[in-house]
Amino acid sequence: MNVSVVILAAGAGTRMKSHIPKVLHKICGKEMLFYSIDEALKISDDVHIVLFHQENVIKERLLCAYKQAYADGALHFHLQDHAHYPGTGGALMQGQNAGANAKKPFCYQYDEILILNGDMPLVCSQTLKSLCQNKAQIVMSVLHLQNPDGYGRVVMESGVVQRIIEQKDAKESELLIKDVNAGVYKIHKSILDLYLPQVGNANNQQEFYLTDVVFYAKENGIEIAALEVKEEEFMGVNSKIQLACAQEIMLQRLREKAMEQGVIMNLPHTIYLESNVTFSGECIIEQGVQILGDSHISDSHIKAHSVIEQSIIESSDVGPLAHIRPKSHIKNTHIGNFVETKSSTLRGVKVGHLSYLGDCEIDEGSNIGAGVITCNYDGKAKHKTTIGKSVFVGSDVQLIAPLNIESNVLIGAGSTITKDIEYGDLALSRVAQQNIKDGFFKFFSDKNEEKKEQ
């Protein structure tokens, strides 16, 4: 679309009570601001982010995540002159460094300007598109709420916006109004050019309000179109409570999307998914499962209370109570309860229970017994274990990396393996067992004598 998008992300977010910038708090594994940017980039190739508080931290994160969009000129950054021009209107002004143009808007590629907030992670591009398709010179989003506390009130007559009043400046009678400003606008560039420089800060907060642009336009006979929107989409996140509420809504969206793609979910409200998780084929996800990061699950069964982090699971069953940690690739494999993997590739393997497999590669047909551990860390560095095809590793075996175990190898239970094993070998590493005649009676007889002496 031929529209420029401005995302306001300059606020301090003090109600979050956190050293982390408000817009970088995560919802389903993704920064709040990233949701707004992603939806904006779906409809525009000219997106502007206005920053101030902790702007270096936010900008660094954005440049890392949106390197290509920035290189292509689709993403731009502006630093608000907060000292001289605070507020939502001030966020659109060039600031004191621009001299005579201090209160003029920034330069945009298109005539239609869509303005939204960086703390609205639930807004959808389709709704933004609806705002932009309205031909009015000013279109604003309006919510009808039973409890409008915290929002600016919208005074309307016959469906037409008359003015907007910030809550802190509202009279008692105006606080009863249920129509509120959802905070997203589409404004023609000519309106901003004309009325933004007229905005002052003679209000209780001594801030420059974007809503005053709407007021001046209305005073000069320009009709303000209102688009009623859903509260769920336009919910602002200003506190940890609102953050949790937004995450619940996002989680439900992610679950429904997965189920629409054919995923079976047992007790879906107990399942946690992050935003970059993908599925393909027929999958079953049981209750209490967490799937995090850029994980991909294909034709697999993830059993109850398992955790999958940043990994690929293909044609496998995992769990219950398994932990697949980052950089694991599990294919055609059975992983049972209390098995943990990390940075490992398993192809056609059986790992029944109670094992840790880190920094290893195991080939098809191999069986890993209970209690097997790859000892991959020597206190200074990680080392790799490689296990070939059709290897049988007995229970309670410690594999001291670096280690190469070739195919068709048998390792006896209880062994500590420190050397490579060649094709077809049997490896044993145990202290010889001794059975001491009547040792039980002698041991406890000595204990009883000690008690008598005391």
From Swiss-Prot:
GO terms for cellular component: cytoplasm; membrane. Keywords: Acyltransferase, Cell shape, Cell wall biogenesis/degradation, Cytoplasm, Magnesium, Metal-binding, Multifunctional enzyme, Nucleotidyltransferase, Peptidoglycan synthesis, Repeat, Transferase. In the N-terminal section; belongs to the N-acetylglucosamine-1-phosphate uridyltransferase family. In the C-terminal section; belongs to the transferase hexapeptide repeat family. SUPFAM superfamilies: Nucleotide-diphospho-sugar transferases, Trimeric LpxA-like enzymes. NCBIfam families: glmU, PRK14359.1. Residues 1-240 are annotated as: Pyrophosphorylase. PROSITE patterns: HEXAPEP_TRANSFERASES (PS00101). The keyword Transmembrane does not apply. It comes from Helicobacter hepaticus (strain ATCC 51449 / 3B1). GO terms for biological process: cell morphogenesis; cell wall organization; lipid A biosynthetic process; peptidoglycan biosynthetic process; regulation of cell shape; UDP-N-acetylglucosamine biosynthetic process. Pfam families: NTP_transf_3 (PF12804). This is Bifunctional protein GlmU. Catalyzes the last two sequential reactions in the de novo biosynthetic pathway for UDP-N-acetylglucosamine (UDP-GlcNAc). The C-terminal domain catalyzes the transfer of acetyl group from acetyl coenzyme A to glucosamine-1-phosphate (GlcN-1-P) to produce N-acetylglucosamine-1-phosphate (GlcNAc-1-P), which is converted into UDP-GlcNAc by the transfer of uridine 5-monophosphate (from uridine 5-triphosphate), a reaction catalyzed by the N-terminal domain. Its EC number is 2.7.7.23, 2.3.1.157. Acetyl-CoA binds at A370, N376, Y377, S395, A413, R430. Pathway: Nucleotide-sugar biosynthesis; UDP-N-acetyl-alpha-D-glucosamine biosynthesis; N-acetyl-alpha-D-glucosamine 1-phosphate from alpha-D-glucosamine 6-phosphate (route II): step 2/2; Nucleotide-sugar biosynthesis; UDP-N-acetyl-alpha-D-glucosamine biosynthesis; UDP-N-acetyl-alpha-D-glucosamine from N-acetyl-alpha-D-glucosamine 1-phosphate: step 1/1; Bacterial outer membrane biogenesis; LPS lipid A biosynthesis. The keyword DNA-binding does not apply.
